[in-house]
Amino acid sequence: SGANVLTFGAGSRLTVL
Protein backbone atom coordinates (compact mmCIF):
# COMPACT_ATOMS: atom_id res chain seq x y z
CA SER A 1 0.00 0.00 0.00
CA GLY A 2 3.00 2.26 0.55
CA ALA A 3 3.69 2.23 -3.20
CA ASN A 4 0.10 3.32 -3.87
CA VAL A 5 0.55 6.32 -1.57
CA LEU A 6 3.74 7.37 -3.38
CA THR A 7 2.08 6.98 -6.78
CA PHE A 8 -0.92 9.05 -5.65
CA GLY A 9 1.39 11.80 -4.39
CA ALA A 10 3.32 11.88 -7.71
CA GLY A 11 0.07 12.06 -9.72
CA SER A 12 -1.20 14.88 -7.51
CA ARG A 13 1.98 16.90 -8.10
CA LEU A 14 1.75 16.34 -11.86
CA THR A 15 -1.86 17.55 -11.79
CA VAL A 16 -0.78 20.73 -9.95
CA LEU A 17 1.85 21.43 -12.62
UniProtKB/Swiss-Prot annotation:
GO terms for cellular component: T cell receptor complex. Keywords: Adaptive immunity, Cell membrane, Immunity, Membrane, Receptor, T cell receptor. GO terms for biological process: adaptive immune response. It is found in: Cell membrane. J region of the variable domain of T cell receptor (TR) beta chain that participates in the antigen recognition. Alpha-beta T cell receptors are antigen specific receptors which are essential to the immune response and are present on the cell surface of T lymphocytes. Recognize peptide-major histocompatibility (MH) (pMH) complexes that are displayed by antigen presenting cells (APC), a prerequisite for efficient T cell adaptive immunity against pathogens. Alpha-beta TR is a heterodimer composed of an alpha and beta chain; disulfide-linked. The alpha-beta TR is associated with the transmembrane signaling CD3 coreceptor proteins to form the TR-CD3 (TcR or TCR). The assembly of alpha-beta TR heterodimers with CD3 occurs in the endoplasmic reticulum where a single alpha-beta TR heterodimer associates with one CD3D-CD3E heterodimer, one CD3G-CD3E heterodimer and one CD247 homodimer forming a stable octameric structure. CD3D-CD3E and CD3G-CD3E heterodimers preferentially associate with TR alpha and TR beta chains, respectively. This is T cell receptor beta joining 2-6. It comes from Homo sapiens (Human). The lineage of its organism: Eukaryota, Metazoa, Chordata, Craniata, Vertebrata. The gene is TRBJ2-6.
